[in-house]
């Protein structure tokens, strides 16, 4: 479960970390009220649980109350990496002396917690990691030993603070709080980027991210409730798929994928990659899917803005090929046709009947998955 920034900052505050003043807003009017209460300048931050929202236009600075109001009208409803902005977090703008990076993850190879710290941070941290990896310090913490003072000293000194200063103590408190959050909330990631030294001399997390292990949510009923009320990182297609009853994951390519069974669907994606294409999604209709489920699955990809081609790969055991074919036919009829190309490979139960149905509507059928995948990639490049 990915927490929104405002939720992550509430956790930081719960563990004694000083955070910048902020208000959650659901409407432009609430943004205006928050800006009036805090006084400009303020920062408007889109609450979507993806990295890189700043570069995508999801963070804006407003120097006047009315500017905050007008900017918020532009930001509400915008799409950032497939997610619609429905909440804005309005925070007080702080003058920053220096930006740093600090995160805590789980290193599964060593079965230990791993702190990553850098005296430089911000939107370009990925580039920094690539070009100057020596600026990032790695500090491992054995969970059976716990976080010790020597761990904290190593991290805080690397961030550039001197022992005995107020900044040292603030940074140390943040390190300790992040570790406690990770342990108490079964977190897979606790991050502040940027962690900032303000011109007033305070060390504060300007941004905060927390990802909680989904398998541990039963231990955190308050988070389960929050997830039910706000699905957060589920796209509109994923939400619709969940409602219908098939498994769907959004990806960034242009070839729509439909398969029956997770293994076959993933193998289909691998074939697309093998021939130089990129899947737009993972969509598993499951075993024994009816024509209604197939119809809705095809409709999802017909409406997908990036999917140029729809590649359907079916092995019919308990899934009947004629039901799949009827589902494709009904989806196309409901849409009034499509300019998207559809490629089908279908083997198994009632295969001949399914072939005949697809032939009626002019959908090509391929003998092998490799041949079909290659054709799908070729069509996507046209």
From Swiss-Prot:
Signal sequence region: none
Gene3D superfamilies: ATP-grasp fold, A domain (3.30.1490.20), ATP-grasp fold, B domain (3.30.470.20), Succinyl-CoA synthetase domains (3.40.50.261)
EC number: 6.2.1.5
Pathway, per record: Carbohydrate metabolism; tricarboxylic acid cycle; succinate from succinyl-CoA (ligase route): step 1/1
Keyword annotations: ATP-binding, Ligase, Magnesium, Metal-binding, Nucleotide-binding, Tricarboxylic acid cycle
Positions bound to ATP: 45, 52-54, 94, 99
Gene Ontology CC, one term: succinate-CoA ligase complex
Protein name: Succinate--CoA ligase [ADP-forming] subunit beta
């Amino acid at each position: 479960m990915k927490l929104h920034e405002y939720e992550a900052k509430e956790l930081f505050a719960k563990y004694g970390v000083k955070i910048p003043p902020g208000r959650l807003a659901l409407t432009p009017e609430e943004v205006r009220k928050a800006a009036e209460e805090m006084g400009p300048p303020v920062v408007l931050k889109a609450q979507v649980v993806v990295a890189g929202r700043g570069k995508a236009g999801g963070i804006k600075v407003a120097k006047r109350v009315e500017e905050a109001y007008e900017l918020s009208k532009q930001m509400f409803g915008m799409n950032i990496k497939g997610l619609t902005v429905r909440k804005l977090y309005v925070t007080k703008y702080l003058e920053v002396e220096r930006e740093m990076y600090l995160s805590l993850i789980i290193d599964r190879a060593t079965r230990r917690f791993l702190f990553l710290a850098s005296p430089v941070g911000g939107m370009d941290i990925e580039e920094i990691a690539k070009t100057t990896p020596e600026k990032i310090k790695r500090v491992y913490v054995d969970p059976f030993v716990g976080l010790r003072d020597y761990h904290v000293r190593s991290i805080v000194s690397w961030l550039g603070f001197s022992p005995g200063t107020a900044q040292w103590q603030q940074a140390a408190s943040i390190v300790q709080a992040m570790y406690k959050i990770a342990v108490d909330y079964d977190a897979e990631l606790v991050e502040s980027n940027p962690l900032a030294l303000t011109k007033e001399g305070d060390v504060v997390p300007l941004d905060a991210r927390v990802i909680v292990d989904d398998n541990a949510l039963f231990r955190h009923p308050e988070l389960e409730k929050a997830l039910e009320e706000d699905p957060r990182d589920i796209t509109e297609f994923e939400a619709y798929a969940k409602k219908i009853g098939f498994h769907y994951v959004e990806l960034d390519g242009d070839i729509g994928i439909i398969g029956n069974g997770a293994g076959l669907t993933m193998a289909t994606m691998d074939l697309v990659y093998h021939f130089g294409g990129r899947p737009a999604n993972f969509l598993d209709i499951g075993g024994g899917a009816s024509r209604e489920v197939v119809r809705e699955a095809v409709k999802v990809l017909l409406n997908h803005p990036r999917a140029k081609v729809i590649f359907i790969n079916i092995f019919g055991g308990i899934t009947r090929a004629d039901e799949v074919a009827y589902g494709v036919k009904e989806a196309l009829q409901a849409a009034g046709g499509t300019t998207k190309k559809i490629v089908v490979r279908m083997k198994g139960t009632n295969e001949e009947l399914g072939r005949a149905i697809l032939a009626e509507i002019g959908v090509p059928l391929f003998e092998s998955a490799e041949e079909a995948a290659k054709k799908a990639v070729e069509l996507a490049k046209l």
